[in-house]
Amino acid sequence: MNRKPDVEVVFEFNGTRMNPAADGYRPAHLITDNYLTTGVHHYYQMNAVPPNGTAKGTITFLSPEAYPHSLWIGKKINIQEGDRIVGYATIVKIFNSLLCSEDRA
């Protein structure tokens, strides 16, 4: 995936994972109440985040055109492996204007 990142976030892992999340990790993200999508994580100034760690970085989503206008600054989305929540990502900046909620802009 060679696209630019869609969002900048603060990652918070909850200790559920057994191993650190390495740069390039591709979990699912609960974008809306009923839409999970894959996204690629890149972490600033670190190669991996511990299972209960936090980091700032970016997410590049697989198919942002499928869930337009669904994100806003401050929204907290689940990071999941299947149905298991392994952490959260809080949106701090939206680079892809297609994703920016018109109601909360």
Q: Where on the chain are the PLM-derived regions?
A:
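C-terminal effector/interaction modules appended to NTPase cores
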Residues: 1-105
